[in-house]
A protein has these predicted regions:
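Short amphipathic alpha-helix segments
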Residues: 59, 118-127, 236-249
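Short, intrinsically disordered, mixed-charge
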Residues: 39-47, 93-101, 153, 157, ...
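Short, conserved charged micro-motifs
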Residues: 33-38, 88-92, 121, 146-153, ...
Length: 299
């Protein structure tokens, strides 16, 4: 991390506002049969969403494996789906193919909005046309492109600092936010993410529901995404490094790694086998020792 990033990091961790402009997908779903179709596709129950409420959900395939993690918002009797750039097209196609089956309409709004991830919950900018989602990071905003410049000026008026890609990666890992194609992909079974309130176990059937419900009601996940804190300040570890128990048994693999200035330790996101998930469990990565830490690293 360079000197400028470290200054901005300390500013944000002290309560200042930081922002980064990113590419994310935004898709609108409407129609009289929208709830019926959506509840057959995703893990959470959109029927429970009141106006302006939001929830996390996932698109699984028939084997319960992950296609995408999304955030859903109900707005004016329509549903807004927010997704990573890496899964945007996949989510859109999964929704669009059902538009021929009933009163169900899908519109891709991505090119109409700019997206800003805000590292702070106290930002006060009123814009009735913007769309806001909460995250572990702070508050994320979709802003109409014609209003983006004004929004940036408002951020600067509130002394917000711009977050570089490298700094965002540090903050992302500290907050335990998984990234598609890095920390999760189509080999991931949805419950392995360990994201709270991602799945409804009380609603009706949906694609992949049988596998996901069986894991919940009859057993437990084989592994789960969690955190690791290394004893060494600057531990030489990398994504895909194997994790072993202190007895030398395979215990998982690392997915993302960074150095946390606040914790003054190397930290990582990792899939860890069920038997070793308890917080503070000691694990080995080569000659290095790390302890399991429940996410996020920093509250």
């Amino acid at each position: 991390m360079n000197e400028r990033d470290l200054e901005n990091y300390n500013f944000i961790r002290a309560g200042g506002i930081g922002f980064i402009e990113q590419k994310r997908g935004l898709i609108e779903v409407s129609g009289k049969e929208a709830v019926q179709f959506l509840n057959g596709l995703i893990t959470n129950d959109v029927a429970k969403l009141e106006e302006s409420e939001r929830m996390y959900a996932a698109f699984p395939n028939a084997q319960g494996r992950l296609l995408a993690v999304i955030r859903v918002m109900r707005r004016n009797d329509k549903f807004l789906f927010e997704t990573e750039a890496a899964t945007h097209e996949k989510v859109y196609q999964n929704l669009f193919r059902f538009t021929f089956a009933g009163d169900f309409f899908v519109e891709d709004l991505t090119e109409k909005y700019g997206y800003f991830s805000i590292a702070n919950y106290k930002l006060q900018i009123t814009n009735s046309d913007s769309i806001e989602f909460d995250s572990r990071f702070g508050r994320d905003r979709f802003v109409p492109k014609e209003a983006a410049e004004e929004f940036l000026n408002e951020l600067k008026n509130q002394a917000a600092v711009e977050i570089s890609g490298e700094l965002y990666e540090v903050l992302r890992i500290e907050q335990g936010i998984p990234l598609y194609a890095v920390d999760m992909d189509e080999t991931t079974i949805v419950p392995e993410l360990g994201i709270e309130n991602l799945i409804s176990y009380n609603k009706g059937c949906y694609i992949g529901q049988e596998i996901i419900a069986r894991i919940y009601f009859r057993g437990h996940i084989a592994k789960q995404l969690t955190g690791l804190i290394f004893e060494n300040e600057a531990a030489p570890v990398n994504p895909d490094d194997e994790i072993k128990s202190t007895e030398g048994k395979n215990a998982g693999r690392i997915t993302s790694v960074t150095f946390s200035p606040k914790l003054e330790k190397t930290i990582a996101l990792a899939f860890v086998r069920y038997d070793y998930l308890a917080e503070d469990t000691a694990l080995k990565i080569g000659d290095l020792t790390a302890k399991v830490k429940n996410l996020p690293f920093i509250v």
